[in-house]
A protein has these predicted regions:
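Active-site microenvironment of metallo-dependent hydrolases
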Residues: 3-38, 42-43, 51, 87-89, ...
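Residue-level marker for buried hydrophobic side chains located in beta-strands
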Residues: 64-66, 126, 260, 455
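Active-site mouth loops of central-metabolism enzymes
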Residues: 66-78, 133-146, 212
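Divalent-metal coordination cores built from histidine and acidic residues
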Residues: 83-190, 486-488
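Short, ordered loop/turn segments at secondary-structure junctions
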Residues: 98-101, 129-130, 166, 196-197, ...
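Short acidic, glycine/serine/threonine-rich loops at helix termini
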Residues: 105-109, 135-141, 172-176, 202-206, ...
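Histidine/acidic residue-rich metal-binding segments in metalloenzymes
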Residues: 143-162, 169-234, 239-260, 270-291, ...
Length: 560
């Protein structure tokens, strides 16, 4: 039994902070789609009164931003540190899926995220991960069955059923999965989707199960079909998947069906901006300002039934102050009347944390990475910059001393995935698109089961990058013979327990080294992390071998 405790922030913990005051300016009322001059009276963290009257101040007071779908773990920061960075950009709440830590630590991991998030003045709304592990073709640290989900959905700290990735299971009515969906319906909690490229009758069956959103659309036509069936579309702009440009035309035709999200945001990018970046970009393209601001806040609040203030009397005093509502940059961020950030500086203190983890991988050796030549073509994963999907093709391999090696001139590199929960031999395949000319990259952030994934030019490079990561019991590493960078992630092998700004700087150094090694990818470590995600087409790699997503089966690396 997992026991959840009340959020002290929503109770008495922060009562000593000054959360009663009056503030005037141009009030942006998204609920009624209007802007007026007035004064907001805040009493004990609540909006006691809004008086419409002339004021001399030209600043704008508007609802804070909401990230409608994010895996906090992908920031490599614990929730309390994620909040410190996010509030500086006007974010007051997140709809958070603890799927990553659940794959490592199960319900204990979910509880860790909830309890750590309660330490700071920020509104985290966590869901119950629906697919842990996401498939049966990989090794994970834990699993959540229907009984676990029923227990979680009964908790007041769980607000929705997280993305249902197993769309074949929905279509074919897998009993265990349907029980999870039924548990969400029983407690009247929304059900999030995850159905890239799903169309036609299969999509209709998926939606008819009660699934209400999708953040995996990367084509406009796909999104329009899903909207026609009643789904809400989350426009995603993260560190790996960037679908804003393809989907933003929906703002002109279906603004009430849209929300903004980041999904996965690495720490250096979170330091630079969050949902506010999407808001400014959308407005700069000429879309209706009110529609854009609603996609960044009100639409998510209504869909997920969040207790986030929308500048209405009786609401929590959750709002931001900006100089220009057509290009909003948060000068002040308030949550429950508490000034949590001002002029880009957070007023949230660093919180110490424990470092729960499971990491039992052994150091690897050169012969573990040997791939014998069989006189056949090999299948190659082709990563796509800015997308989670991959392409695939076959080619003649480069062979040295009877073994297949990386073909640097053609950008075909060796990629490996290693079980980190039990000692096991690496699974080895080949990938195009990373562009490394020397060295190797490794990560224990490897969606969804978070085994070790690495890519490199030589077996020696891969070996050193992986063993450096194992030495730290998790993290990301960039290695070459002359320099190396490691960012330790001791919390579940996913998150750091250090100051968020220091983590962002360290990760930026690792990314910089990856690019000096030759990678042209926008976010090489984020792209690497998704090369083991078996629920997104077309060809991926698990710790058990190469995986053909269209056939939903492990396959040989050799042409068959």
């Amino acid at each position: 039994m997992v026991v959840f405790y009340p959020n002290p922030y929503l109770c008495a913990k922060f009562e000593s902070m000054n959360n009663s005051f009056t503030i005037g300016g141009q009030i942006v009322d998204l609920v009624n789609s209007r802007i007026f001059s007035g004064v907001v009276v805040v009493n004990d963290g609540k909006i006691a009164k809004i008086e419409e009257q002339p004021v001399g101040n030209t600043r704008y007071i508007m609802p804070g931003f909401v990230d409608a779908h994010v895996h906090i773990e992908s920031s490599m920061l614990i929730p309390s540190e994620f909040a410190r960075l996010a509030v500086c950009h006007g974010t007051v709440a997140t709809v958070s899926d603890p799927h990553e830590i659940a794959n490592v630590l199960g319900k204990d991991g979910i509880r860790y995220m909830i309890e750590n998030g309660k330490k700071v003045p920020f509104k985290f709304y966590f869901g119950a991960p629906s697919c842990v592990p996401s498939t049966a073709f990989e090794s994970a640290g834990s699993s959540l069955d229907a009984n676990d989900i029923e227990e979680l959905m009964a908790s007041p700290d769980i607000y929705y059923l997280s993305e249902v990735m197993n769309y074949p299971g929905v279509i074919h009515k897998d009993p265990n999965l349907m029980r999870k969906i039924a548990a969400a319906k029983k407690h009247d909690k929304p059900i999030d989707g995850h159905a890239p490229t799903l169309t036609g009758k299969a999509l209709q069956k998926y939606v008819s199960a009660g699934i209400t959103t999708d953040h995996e659309c990367f084509q406009l036509e796909e999104a329009l079909e899903k909207i026609s069936l009643g789904m809400k579309i989350l426009i995603r702009e993260g560190s790996a998947a960037r679908n804003f440009d393809a989907l933003i035309p929906l703002m002109a035709t279906h603004p009430d069906k849209l929300m903004f999200c980041s999904d996965d945001k690495h720490p250096d990018e979170l330091d630079d901006g969050h949902i506010d970046v999407l808001v400014r970009k959308a407005i700069s393209l000429g879309y209706n300002v009110m529609d854009v601001l609603k996609a960044a806040s009100l639409n998510a609040v209504r869909h997920y039934n969040l207790n986030v203030g929308m500048l209405q009397e009786g609401d929590d005093a959750d709002f931001i102050v900006v100089d220009d509502f057509k290009s909003p940059v948060a000068r002040q961020t308030y949550i429950k009347g508490v000034l949590v950030a001002e002029n880009g500086v957070a007023n949230i203190k660093y919180e110490e944390t424990q470092t729960p983890n499971i990491f039992k991988a052994n150091f690897i050796h050169a012969d573990d990475l040997f791939v014998p030549d069989k006189g056949k073509k090999i299948k190659v994963i082709e990563c796509v910059d800015g997308q989670l999907i991959t392409n695939c093709f076959t080619t003649d391999p480069k062979v040295v001393n009877g073994g297949i090696v990386s073909d640097v001139e053609n950008d075909i590199l060796k990629i490996v995935v290693i079980n980190r929960y039990h000692p096991a031999k690496p699974a080895v395949a080949f990938i195009k698109g990373f562009g490394l000319r020397r060295g190797a990259l490794a990560s224990s952030v490897a969606h969804d089961s978070h085994n070790i994934v690495a890519v490199g030019v030589t077996d020696s490079d891969i070996l050193h990058a992986v063993n450096l990561l194992i030495e730290h019991t998790g993290g990301v590493t960039a290695y070459c013979s002359t320099e190396m960078v490691a960012v330790p992630l001791p919390v579940a092998g996913l998150m750091s327990n250090e100051d968020g700004y220091e983590v962002a700087a360290a990760y930026e150094n690792a990314t910089a080294l990856a690019k000096r090694l030759g990678s042209k990818l926008y976010a090489p470590f984020m792209t690497l992390a998704f090369m083991a995600l078996l629920v997104i087409p077309e060809l991926k790699l698990s710790d058990r071998g190469l995986f053909d997503v269209s056939k939903f089966a492990v396959c040989s690396i050799y042409e068959e």
